[in-house]
Amino acid sequence: MSTSLLFEQLNFLILVAAEAELPIAHSTRKLLMDNSCNNCQIYELYNENLKDVKTDKDWFMNKFGPQTVHFVISNTINFPFYKIVYFDLLIPVVSHTWVQDSVKTKRHLRTNMYSPNPFHLLRDCQVYISKSSFNKCEYILYSDLLHLLGGTLVNYISNRTTHVIVQSPQDPIIATVSKLTFGSFSSSSTNKHTEKPLREWKFVYPIWILYHFKMAKPLKGELATLCELDMQDTSEEQLFAKWEEVIGDKQTSSSQLTLHPNKTLFKNHHFAISPDLNFFTPLYWFLKGFIEDLDGKVTPLSFSDDLKSVYQAFPDIDCYIGHSANSPILEKTKSIKPEIHVGNVSWLFYMFALQKFTPVSQCKLIHQPFHAKLFTSKELTVAYTNYFGSQRFYIQRLVEILGGLSTPELTRKNTHLITKSTIGKKFKVAKKWSLDPQNAIIVTNHMWLEQCYMNNSKLNPKDSRFQNFKLDDNMGWNIGQIGMDHSSLPTPKNLSMVTYDTQSISEKPPPTNDQMDQINDNTNVLSKKDGTPISSFENSIDEKIDKLQKISGEVAVTHSGDLERSFVSRPSRASFPVVDSKKSNLQKKDSNSDISMETEVFCEGHEKREEKEFTKPITEYDAPKKQEIREQSRKKNDIDYKKEEEETELQVQLGQRTKREIKTSKKNEKEKETNECHIEVDQMTNEKQGEESTGKLISTEDVTSKKDTDKFSHLFEGLSDNDDHINDEKPAVNSKYTTPKTSQNITSGVDTPTTAQTQVFMPSSGNSRLAKTQAAKRLHTDIESLNEFQKNFKRKRIDSEEISLSQDVERSNNNKELATKAEKILARFNELPNYDLKAVCTGCFHDGFNEVDIEILNQLGIKIFDNIKETDKLNCIFAPKILRTEKFLKSLSFEPLKFALKPEFIIDLLKQIHSKKDKLSQININLFDYEINGINESIISKTKLPTKVFERANIRCINLVNDIPGGVDTIGSVLKAHGIEKINVLRSKKCTFEDIIPNDVSKQENGGIFKYVLIVTKASQVKKFTKLINDRDKNETILIVEWNWCVESIFHLNVDFTSKKNVLYQKKNN
């Protein structure tokens, strides 16, 4: 029976090296299950022959996945996949004692202290490395060595800190720490007692870490004393003397690889060391000696080197070690040797841990030279939860190189909480704080940090991809699994992720002042400041208006004298977002990813911070509220969207109509001019053709004028497609409005044939000028009409959005009211569980729940869904017993099914919550007491397998008779949920052999896969189908069953071909 929720949602793997360890393994497993662990597997190493098995990451994930393994429990590291587990997947490996002590203390203890790795000499140490003494390159190297030795790096000093690493007695941190007190602070006004620190910190030189690393054993005696700070060491000569002892110590050099036998790790590899690794000289000697002791070669580079000559002199250089990704040395190196391996110091120690040379492309993000900082510490102050062991170090390093700070506790000073699941107090508190508009904290997952760094740009942490807190469902989503081999992933522009800081677009040179002025003028037609594209409908309207005004502008150029005062052309649309030139320049500037040199001192229980640090609003990113409201209303209101589509259609029709009328008007004017020529010709020749033509043209104009009733139909009048003064782009602009000519268009547009006399008598220039002048005069009215149309259109759209917004506000207020009621009811409990159940109900709760109870369940992590949808990722079923309903049968296909519970769980839970008893510490409801009888752990565990029940039985295609009770749709959906790929419905009365589909037997090795599988309801159907198949394919295997056979297989999640129950006919290979 479960006694606590200590290991809730956590998965464990217990490794047993010898049979004698089995009792302790089962005892540990029982302890884990009693404290609510999600899953615990026992793997007997002594029964497995893994010598010929490639135990790589894929093997481990397939063997023990797909869900994340949070902890591996083993008293030894002598198993073949230790390095994959600990260094690659970043899964802590702890002894059995960790479980026992964690249960005793009721908290997850630090995993380093319980590591079975003998090289973790500093497992009991919490070390602060002074940022005043060391530059960023040295800080990275020392922290990497500390992590490799199992120590814990802290960026604050507390009473748990054991060591402080400094370079000299003059380090300012020494004076700061010596003044620290814990408990009550001295105060003359309150006369509070001042307590002394709970421990004496040891101040040590960095050689303390180097000696541990080189000797691979604890320091004792004179060596330990040598590493401790001596306040008398005031001269550089004295400090150098200590370094020379550790660098030149032959004993330590020879024992460096005691526990790491691969002494030829860097054989055939030549390392070029970049000058941007600004090391203290003795530290460079140490690094050089480290590489050479592992059979590698080293060539230092300098900024004055002719790199081409260096690489020609040493053609075997194949590795580059540097600090900054923006170094000019690195840029030149890549151009000369594009195939070179480019890494940083962390990469060297990572390979040392793996005992294998590994290209940077197969390592972690943090193993390449670092990008410039993206954030400031005010923008990125991170707390984290639900990460263990090396995962915390990885987050700390990512945050550091992004420019931020990480803190152990969650306070109002934090800007972000990083988590991969929804359990824990930090998550609940952060979610509450996230609702505070003045000082909201953003809850996001670790993929946000990784993607920001990998893409070298600030991404929106509220993007749906970074709001996925179910990352434990897939081991491939573990932190640190995005490596440099993913560097070709899409950039933020085409990621469906919204870039929320425009200064990240810094690849292009910053715009000039003139360009910035133009950009600022065009702000009203750019995409939104948050990067979201403007809707296609707005674009289509703007494009149409642009086209009209472009035509008008071209006419205005031709007739500048007439239009100078009456028309101002619309500014052209910018094709890039607004970028602050100052921000752009700052972004482009190389900051070399400096790690903040601030020294933070945390006093537990009494954190010394100024009040303003807690109350100052933290600005994450600003999107215009008006645009946000419109975006929300578009997403939430299908009615508005349909109205917009109707308006768009009307606009297109308007464009088509105006285009036709342009053509009509244009040709009428031409024919009128031609007609005047004919009149003059008639007067000279006395012919009647001109009079007839005139009569026809007048009648055509009358018809056109009657049709011209639309308010905006005159917009294109007077603007001829063939006007010589319009440039060649004109037809392309108007091509969108071109419509096929109707018979009427053709009639009205027939040109009068011209004769030789017509060519002699050209129309007067006055008539041409008259037409153009009229067109120019109408431009005022045209633009006013357009503006009026825009206003009307926007007014309609805003009105509909306001209606939708009022509905949203009402709904939001109702939700807040329900949430408040639920919180008030739950307030009498000190602790609230997060059950993380997404469930459907069958055979119970027919009347549903009231709104307050639904909100209460939601706040406890229980969500009830009406129907089963694959996208909802359901993991629970509520039913009074095992049922044959569609929902129950499908629930056994959930990936995974975590619980099959009786409805009494909900009833008792709500009963306890609504009881009038005194305030309770926690809700005393045990999930395991409500499990449905018959759905045991063995069945639950099978839902975590990567394949479904019928898929495992090699049944992928099945034939189903059309008269099956329940209906073919329902039965078919259940079968598909459990692995059937193709379902063929047979009409038993009119069925032929060709109607029966065979099963997929392509993977058949030694027989055993039935070629024909059928589900029938009558004995007569069996006789008919067996005859059809045996007559045409008599040598093939057949399986004919009742529906009950499928149901039994689903209930057990196993197909038993040896059982004859519900099998009507079976034919196997001889």
Curated annotation (Swiss-Prot):
GO CC annotation: cell periphery; Cul8-RING ubiquitin ligase complex; nucleus
PTM remark: Phosphorylated by MEC1.
Listed Basic and acidic residues bias regions: 580-592, 603-615, 622-645, 722-731
Extra information: Present with 1380 molecules/cell in log phase SD medium.
Compartments where located: Nucleus
Matching Pfam families: BRCT, PTCB-BRCT, RTT107_BRCT_5, RTT107_BRCT_6
Database matches in SMART domains: BRCT (SM00292)
Biased composition (Polar residues): 735-753
GO molecular function ontology, one term from the record: chromatin binding
Bridged cysteine pairs (disulfide): none
Modified residues annotated as Phosphothreonine in this record: 532
Subunit and partners: Forms a complex with the cullin-RING ligase (CRL) RTT101(MMS1-MMS22). Interacts with MMS22 and RTT101. Interacts with histone H2A; requires H2A to be phosphorylated (gamma-H2A). Interacts with RAD55.
Main location: nucleus
Gene Ontology biological-process annotations: DNA double-strand break attachment to nuclear envelope; double-strand break repair; nucleosome assembly; regulation of DNA damage checkpoint; regulation of DNA double-strand break processing; transposable element silencing
Positions carrying Phosphoserine: 304, 591, 593, 720, 800, 806
Keywords: DNA damage, DNA repair, Nucleus, Phosphoprotein, Repeat
Biological classification of the source: Eukaryota, Fungi, Dikarya, Ascomycota, Saccharomycotina
Biological role: Required for resumption of chromosome replication after DNA damage, specifically in S phase. Is recruited to chromatin in the presence of RTT109 and RTT101 in response to stalled replication forks and acts as a scaffold during DNA repair.
Gene label: RTT107
Region (Disordered): 572-659, 722-753
Domain BRCT: 2-103, 117-213, 260-352, 369-453, 829-910, 934-1049
Protein name: Regulator of Ty1 transposition protein 107
